[in-house]
């Protein structure tokens, strides 16, 4: 099992820091929203909660953002499905989840997509940022348990897939996670950004709704 990858980002290096919900191949929508936010790549940072690919029409264009110094991402379950398909040769689950875009690419584009997706073997599962003494932890779906600790070993699947915590929250059973002030997640789709206890869910379903949500850390 691969070890859990954490990364700390120094907020002082940037004018503004935004976290974006699941992009799912909506490159043009992302660019439009960044323009509306007056995002300036030379001094701002954009962090994705993962699931950059699938469903939308421009997954490769979104993956190419990994080459830009102003963009980074944690790993999502859709990136994990793609990597598993490459490693096992069984792409059925990925195809059923929107991975068909890959097979519409030509050979050189497919190789480029593979090379970019392989970056998720090294990109973090969790990003930690502290700004104005407020500590944020960013992961794709959840941070299991009730205590966050930078560097704690966690099974990758527990960060990429679970929805049980948020489902309990929807039923009124709020669960605080200690160790950070706020946790920012995607994965679970809502019409608008939702906050339960100290967990903020920012996936608003861009391919189906035309909504792509951002949370401003700084």
Swiss-Prot record:
UniProt protein name: Serine/threonine-protein phosphatase 2
Function, in words: Has been shown, in vitro, to act on Ser, Thr and Tyr-phosphorylated substrates.
Residues given in the record as Mn(2+) 2 binding sites: 51, 77, 187
Keywords on record: Hydrolase, Manganese, Metal-binding, Protein phosphatase
GO molecular function, one term: metal ion binding
Family from the record: Belongs to the PPP phosphatase family.
EC number annotated for this UniProt entry: 3.1.3.16
Sites where the protein binds Mn(2+) 1: 22, 24, 51
Free-text cofactor note: Binds 2 manganese ions per subunit.
SUPFAM superfamilies listed in its UniProt record: Metallo-dependent phosphatases
Residues the record marks as active site: 78
Protein encoded by which gene: pphB
PANTHER family documented for this protein: METALLOPHOSPHOESTERASE, SERINE_THREONINE-PROTEIN PHOSPHATASE 2
Source organism: Escherichia coli (strain K12)
Effect of residue 78 to N: In prpB17; loss of function
């Amino acid at each position: 099992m691969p070890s859990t990858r954490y990364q700390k980002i120094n907020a002082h290096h940037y004018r503004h820091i935004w976290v974006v919900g699941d992009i799912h191949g909506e490159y043009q929508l992302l660019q439009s929203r960044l323009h509306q936010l007056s995002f300036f790549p030379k001094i701002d940072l954009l962090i994705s909660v993962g699931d950059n690919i699938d469903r939308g029409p421009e997954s490769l264009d979104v993956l190419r953002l990994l080459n830009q110094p102003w963009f980074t991402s944690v790993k999502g379950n859709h990136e994990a499905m793609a990597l598993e398909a490459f490693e096992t040769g069984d792409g059925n689950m990925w195809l059923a989840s929107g991975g068909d875009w890959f097979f519409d690419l030509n050979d050189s584009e497919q190789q480029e997509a593979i090379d970019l997706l392989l970056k998720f073997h090294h990109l973090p599962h969790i990003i930690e940022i502290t700004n104005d003494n407020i500590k944020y932890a960013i992961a794709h779906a959840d941070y299991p348990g009730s205590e966050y600790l930078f560097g704690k070993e966690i099974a990758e699947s527990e960060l990429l897939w679970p929805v049980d915590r948020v489902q309990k929250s929807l039923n009124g059973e709020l669960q605080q996670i200690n160790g950070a002030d706020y946790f920012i997640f995607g994965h679970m789709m809502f019409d608008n950004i939702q906050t339960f206890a100290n967990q903020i869910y920012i996936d608003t379903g861009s391919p189906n709704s035309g909504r792509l949500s951002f949370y401003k850390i700084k």
